Amino acid sequence: EVTFDVSDVEEPQQENTVENRKKKASYVIASPFDGIAGDITTAPDEGFAGKMMGDGAAVEPTDPVVKAPADGEISFIFPTHHAIGFVTADGMEMLLHIGIDTVKLNGEGFEILVEEGAKVKKGDALMKIDLDYVKSHAPSLVSPILCTDLKENEKVRLLKTGAVKAGEDLFAVDIYE
């Protein structure tokens, strides 16, 4: 009886990009606020647009309440209150960065509603933004919502552009074999 392993069969060489592999899972990240969603490459900041901090989406908030984008845990709160580190229940490390160059506001315009280490559910309020203050004191309200530790086999797929509501699917992280 002849047996052979499928891996012994030569296949025509395909471009070995991640997208050609089989997708094995997807995690969906919700928008943390009502606003206008766009691709991260549209963020008005080269570091974020160039995905130096991670990949995700950029959302300009129209509502002051920042909500948890998934079930998870608050991993850190910047001393200047303009950004929150978040780890989803699936272990995805995220950064919710409100506005551009907002570190310079030294916490003015941001009210944190949670503590580091807090376990939260998708939709729980994390922060309140004084939209008028931040808009008039920072270059932009556009807020990068990022996955900061994506592995080589994990890719972001934007699910929503334009008007988005808090809790609506914003992007997926597809995990390939």
Annotate the PLM regions.
Residues 4-177:
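Contiguous, well-folded functional domains in the mature portion of proteins
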